[in-house]
Amino acid sequence: MNIPIPYVMEQTRYGERSYDIYSRLLKDRIIFIGDEITDTLANSVTAQLLFLASTDPEKDISIYINSPGGSVSAGFAILDTMLYIKPDIQTICTGMAASFAAVLLVGGTKGKRCALPHAEVMIHQPHGGMKGQASDMDIYAQRILKQRKEINHFIAERTGQTPDKIATDSERDYFMSAAEAKDYGVIDNILPV
């Protein structure tokens, strides 16, 4: 089911202008990740990050996250761009940051990673399905184990937890409330409502 995208009207010196809500938020340097992380979403978010960095490399960018996660490679495309560009990135979890969305949340600039009071964070090991020849399945299994190690080390580095603790906690779905995510080091602040 496609949910219609809201439009907002804004008065300019040239008259009234209509924006879809995401374009209007982008004017205020706000990016919203509110869906599964796919290549299409990653390309859009990456383009927005690059655009905002080129227009003002000194001004913060805010990324609001309410996502179940998704593709690891698409997630890394967003994460690497966040880390590559000059502006600080404020990340805000507004509902759920699960799987790679949690990695994006923790990937924000330290001191600027936030959640709303009822937000949840979930970390787990990468998922994947395999079929085909045994040699192909072995290649895929090695790839997913490498990704898991990279993700665990990144989360450990950003949270202050040990890689072994991250590996143990993410063996299965590991849910955290906003307060628990703050104690764990995923976020720095819980925003008041």
Swiss-Prot record:
CDD domains, per the entry: S14_ClpP_2
SUPFAM superfamilies associated with the record: ClpP/crotonase
Location (main, coarse): cytoplasm
Catalytic activity, EC: 3.4.21.92
Record GO terms (molecular function): ATP-dependent peptidase activity; ATPase binding; serine-type endopeptidase activity
UniProt catalytic activity: Hydrolysis of proteins to small peptides in the presence of ATP and magnesium. alpha-casein is the usual test substrate. In the absence of ATP, only oligopeptides shorter than five residues are hydrolyzed (such as succinyl-Leu-Tyr-|-NHMec, and Leu-Tyr-Leu-|-Tyr-Trp, in which cleavage of the -Tyr-|-Leu- and -Tyr-|-Trp bonds also occurs)
Keyword Hydrolase (UniProt): yes
Keywords linked to the UniProt accession: Cytoplasm, Hydrolase, Protease, Serine protease
Localization of this protein: Cytoplasm
Cross-referenced Pfam families: CLP_protease
One GO cellular component term: endopeptidase Clp complex
Residues forming the catalytic site: S99, H124
Top-level taxon in the UniProt lineage: Bacteria
Hydrolase found in the keyword field: yes
GO biological process: protein quality control for misfolded or incompletely synthesized proteins
Family note: Belongs to the peptidase S14 family.
Function: Cleaves peptides in various proteins in a process that requires ATP hydrolysis. Has a chymotrypsin-like activity. Plays a major role in the degradation of misfolded proteins.
Subunit structure: Fourteen ClpP subunits assemble into 2 heptameric rings which stack back to back to give a disk-like structure with a central cavity, resembling the structure of eukaryotic proteasomes.
Name assigned to this protein: ATP-dependent Clp protease proteolytic subunit 1
The organism of origin for this protein: Shouchella clausii (strain KSM-K16)
Gene: clpP1
